[in-house]
Structure formats: C-alpha cells, structure tokens
Amino acid sequence: MPKVITISDDVYDKLSKLKKGRSFSETINELIEFYNKNRKGNKDVLLQMFGILNEEEATEMASETLNIRKSFRFRAVENGDT
C-alpha cells in the first residue's frame, strides 16, 4: 500500500538525479539496500558510490589505513597511555 512521505526540496532534487528512469520507491529501496550492505565501513563504498578508486587503490588504501591504526595503538601502549 502506498505511503506519503514529506522530503525537503533539496532531497527531492538529489533523488530525482539518482533515479534515472526508475521510480522513487526503487531508488530509495536501492539506497537502503546499499546502506545496509556497506554500513560497517566497506571499501566498496568508495568504489560504488564515487568510483574514485579502482580495486587495487582501494585495497592499498585499506592496508595503509590499518597500518597507521596499528602504529597509533603501539605508540599508546609503549608510552603507557591507554
């Protein structure tokens, strides 16, 4: 059964640009599915949403980020900080 929702003009404009011939319901559903699939910080978010990184670059960025995070944890323990 259809439901009526209210959205701001700027959100409407953004959804209109995203829908590309699909219904608003299909577009919103796709966004929700995408969010649910990627809400835990998946590198594919950048690939799918923005297309700014290829698979190799995304993997390298994830690896570098992990190394940086590990180095901060190591320093904190080494200096006696918690």
Curated annotation (Swiss-Prot):
Superkingdom of the organism of origin: Archaea
Pfam families: VAPB_antitox
Keywords: Toxin-antitoxin system
Record's keyword annotation contains Cell wall biogenesis/degradation: no
Transmembrane regions listed in the UniProt entry: none
Role noted for this protein: Possibly the antitoxin component of a type II toxin-antitoxin (TA) system.
Family: Belongs to the UPF0330 family.
Name of the protein this chain belongs to: Putative antitoxin Saci_0468
